[in-house]
A protein has these predicted regions:
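Conserved beta-loop-alpha segment that forms the PLP phosphate-binding cup at the N-terminus of a helix
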Residues: 76-79
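Multi-pass membrane proteins that catalyze or facilitate reactions on polyprenyl-/lipid-phosphate substrates
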Residues: 1-72, 83-277, 281-395
Length: 395
């Protein structure tokens, strides 16, 4: 498989930056080490790194991949990393980008899990998080502003985005919101097309349904042990949409209520560790795997929960260019994109309410937003400064 160059899917004017696998690895190792704040913040950092600074992708290409990442199961920010690696270096880049983005968080979470098993408690990191969260909000606001200016091409798409945001605030499921956004965005073109000629469905995006069914069946029938642990987490990675709170519900049903491998306190501690460490929240699996099966369990659980994402992205990489060649399908993709941004905006608002709790955090958020939007300061320095301030002020 030859690498897919960024210009191929988006046409003239797209970046054609050539990069090595080593450069892909180094960039995603860096991002995996500093990417605090959950998927919205991770995606914001990737937009700044790969669209604004390195110009590996156009903003339109980035938005297309973001739309698909929100449509397929699994961790959206990890899938974005895999997409970008695939764009620049084909299948090798897909593996390298995904693995190097996951690796720092997995190592950190594994170390915390080791201390947790030994001492029965979590390290105290409240001071660092106190100052870090407002900076994360600023990073998300910066990305949302830049992406929205590109994605909302018409007044109708703006209305679709507003409908999606209100629906999400009313707790409508994310996948249903994206489906409705796609239908609404494509409706005008679809109506005109149906008036002139019969139309086959534009596209279907139900990746690997048989494989997902096999994973679910196997996870409920395999014997106890590391193999069963692997299948449980593969099932979760193959069917999970949504946030870390959705992950909590899946793991509660399987590991606490079903298999009785964890207590509720251990599960909540595991999700907390996934939230406070950099990189994908799904490295919660690393923590749980270590508690259940030591180092082998941590490795097996991590591979299991992330493996479906690599497969889904590899398949979706063939779909995106075909979607863009169809006028109606492209319009529906635009709907998915603005729907995804609407979800991102509502999540940013929810996170801001939790992060900005007093005058110092409000000042940090405002100053960070101004530095990012007006002076384009690298978010890495803001994160480092905020972490140090929080440690000294509240540690």
């Amino acid at each position: 498989m030859h690498p897919i160059r960024a210009g191929e899917a988006a046409g003239a004017g797209a970046p054609t930056v050539e990069v090595s696998l080593g450069e892909v690895a180094l960039v995603f190792l860096k991002l995996g080490t500093i990417a605090f704040g959950g998927p919205a913040a991770h995606i914001a950092m990737m937009e700044d790194e790969f669209v604004t600074r390195r110009r590996w992708l156009t903003r339109e290409q980035f938005l297309d991949r973001l739309g698909v990442a929100n449509l397929i199961p699994g961790p959206s920010s990890t899938e974005m990393a895999i997409f970008i690696g695939y764009e620049k270096r084909g299948w090798a880049g897909l593996l390298v980008a995904g693995c190097t983005f996951i690796l720092p968080a997995a190592i950190i979470v594994g170390a915390i899990a080791s201390a947790y098993v030994r001492y029965g408690t979590l390290p105290q990191v409240n001071g660092v998080l106190y100052a870090l969260k407002p900076v994360v909000i600023a990073v998300v606001i910066q990305a949302f502003w830049k992406l929205a200016r590109t994605a909302v091409k018409t007044a109708w798409l703006g209305i679709v985005a507003l409908i999606a945001a209100v629906s999400y605030a009313l707790r409508v499921h994310e996948v249903l919101i994206l489906a409705i956004a796609a239908i609404l965005a494509g409706a005008p073109l679809l109506y005109r097309a149906l008036r002139t000629r019969p139309l086959l469905p534009a596209f279907f995006l139900t990746p690997m349904t048989p494989a997902r069914a096999v994973a679910i069946f196997a996870a409920t029938s395999a014997p106890f042990g590391l193999w069963r642990l692997f299948l449980v987490f593969t099932k979760v990675g193959a069917v999970l949409f949504g946030s870390g709170y959705v992950l909590l519900a899946f793991l509660q049903a399987d590991l606490v209520d079903g298999l009785h491998w964890l207590t509720e306190r251990q599960l909540l501690d595991a999700v907390a560790v996934g939230q406070i460490t950099p990189g994908p929240v799904f490295t919660t699996a690393t923590f749980i795997g270590y508690i259940i099966g030591g180092t082998p369990g941590a490795i097996i659980a991590t591979i299991g929960i992330f493996a479906p994402a690599f497969l889904f992205v590899g398949i979706s990489g063939f779909v995106i260019p075909r979607i863009r060649r169809s006028t109606i399908a492209a319009a529906m993709m635009d709907g998915v994109v603005v729907g995804s941004l609407a979800l991102m905006g509502v999540v940013a608002w929810q996170l801001a309410r939790a992060a900005i709790i007093d005058l110092p955090t409000l000042v940090i958020a405002i100053v960070s937003t101004a530095l990012l939007l007006r002076f384009r300061v690298n978010s890495v320095w803001l994160i480092a400064a905020a972490g140090a301030f929080g440690w000294l002020y509240r540690g």
